[in-house]
UniProtKB/Swiss-Prot annotation:
Name of this chain's protein: UPF0398 protein Bcer98_1280
InterPro entries xref list: YspA
Protein family per UniProt: Belongs to the UPF0398 family.
Domain of life, source organism: Bacteria
Protein species of origin: Bacillus cytotoxicus (strain DSM 22905 / CIP 110041 / 391-98 / NVH 391-98)
Length: 184
């Protein structure tokens, strides 16, 4: 696997409203573990669309890993131009920081937001251009990742494509490990 599309919940879907929320640490640890395993399998590129939450946290994990794995690259393909224009200032700054550090940045539709169709096009693009999908997603709590997961499942039925998930139970395991380690 050379190209991994990464997505997941937006912060509000997880009840997270600040980047220093403890849940962010556990999500980033889970992403880090998955990325390490995929690096052993030849991972070269991580693709995100730049949405707030899991995708930008994944970008931060990639940047951390690049210190040890300099060949690992981050691509940000936004669904449309200026997706951040209605975000809070601190989120805009965080997003701009990610874009500045990314190895490749482009917009899929190359125009400003016009319709939800641009999100459908983004989902299709991500699945078409990647070898696998990693989603922080649990089918018991559908949310914004549901649509790209459905596209990935359709591709899995006809091609050699794989979807990997970080479930809430995986995050709970990490929390318990951390608590166990802190108790020792």
């Amino acid at each position: 696997m050379k190209v991994l599309a990464v997505t997941g919940y937006k912060p509000f879907e997880l009840g997270i409203f600040q980047n220093d929320h403890p849940g962010v640490t556990y999500i980033k640890k889970a992403l880090h573990r998955k990325f390490l395993a995929f690096l052993e399998e030849g991972l070269e590129w991580v693709m995100i669309s730049g949405q707030l939450g899991v995708e930008l946290w994944a970008a931060e994990v990639v940047f951390d890993l690049q210190l040890e794995y300099p060949d690992l690259k981050l691509a940000v393909f936004t669904p449309f131009l200026a997706q951040e224009e209605n975000w809070k200032e601190e989120n805009k700054e965080w997003y701009e920081f990610i874009l500045e550090q990314a190895d490749h940045v482009d917009s899929i539709t190359k125009r400003r937001y016009e319709s939800p169709e641009q999100f459908r096009l983004k989902n299709q693009f991500f699945i078409d251009k990647s070898d696998a999908l990693l989603a922080v997603y649990d089918e018991e709590k559908p949310g914004s990742p549901k649509y790209i997961v459905e596209v990935a499942k359709k591709k899995e039925e006809i091609e050699n494509y794989h979807s990997y998930f970080i479930l809430f139970s995986d995050l709970q395991d990490i929390i318990e490990e951390e608590q166990w380690n802190d108790a020792e």
